[in-house]
């Protein structure tokens, strides 16, 4: 969240207000109903409706239909209970923080006292949670590497200097690392009356000690006007209103604007910190299909939003749990990590199927399952023409499979 005020009192009031906004994610990714003509393994062609993820054309079909065309038994049920002390497995709880303080008079919910952060980390260790590095998280998500049970990734947003002065010593004390998502323009062009932000030199020092710094846009961390009435939405995920021409920007203008911003942020992070990989946290947790496509085009595979849930390989756009609220005691902050329901698992012919895309979901009383993931798990090749809606399934030959 960007803060640009002339009086400290107003500055911290604005922190409170913007913290309230930042924890409300805005998502603009959706499924569109589409007509399909599917030729199954038995050669029979069936006409049906399905849902397609608009960004990548992943198909979600009725489970009963999938069983018919694939000639397989498909299950979608809760995983067996885990042993005592293990709260989740093969998932990562990504925790989100923003600003720390050691000022006892700074009593705003979204600004966490440093002592409270220290207590949280101590309890994480005591309660059997395992803080992992960004490298471990990346390998887990992209290379199917294992992570410990009760794995946790610590992340911060906005690049406040309190990360260097307060969080960094506490992290080192516990032997932990963390990621900070930087509003890069705030580092390149510091604003005098803004809450202090990190410098490149501070980040270089911390990077040598294992901390990581990634993209929170160059200069799109703001709400911008999207209509003639002055309504606003997050600038990174909305078609902005052009006053002089009384219109919203076109898709190609949006792509050019946002691609240019994110690419510039990536370049600066590489130039100053030597980054060789990428990740992004979306401002305000807001994203849409176009923004996801832009990130993919720039090689930014790992993405983070805001939401209560665990990170898994089913999506590279992971939710993050807000642990940076001072009203949440350390004990309660840890307790909420223990409350996640056992994950649902997809099985094919009684065999657990790893997912690297959208999970099944219940819609209008029917279970929708990801057809491409099922085909991959069964060694079936799926040919899908999104323009015509024609799908053809053929077994992968042993030679091709081997």
Task: Show which residues each predicted segment covers.
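Metal-dependent polysaccharide deacetylase catalytic core of the NodB/CE4 family, i.e.
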Residues: 95, 100-101, 107, 151-152, ...
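Extracellular/periplasmic catalytic domains that process cell-envelope and extracellular macromolecules
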Residues: 86-90, 145-148, 172-175, 205-208, ...
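Primary recognition of N-terminal secretory signal peptides and signal-anchoring hydrophobic helices
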Residues: 2-86, 90, 95, 332-402
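Substrate-binding cleft of extracellular glycoside hydrolase catalytic domains
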Residues: 136-137, 149, 153-162, 166, ...
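Solvent-exposed, polar/charged alpha-helical surfaces in well-ordered, non-transmembrane soluble domains
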Residues: 64, 68, 115-122, 126, ...
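Soluble non-cytosolic domains of exported or imported proteins
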Residues: 56-61, 111-115, 161-162, 197, ...
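Extended hydrophobic/aromatic segments used for targeting, binding, or gating
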Residues: 288-330
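N-terminal pre-catalytic segment of deacetylase/amide-hydrolase enzymes
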Residues: 40, 71-152, 316, 320-347
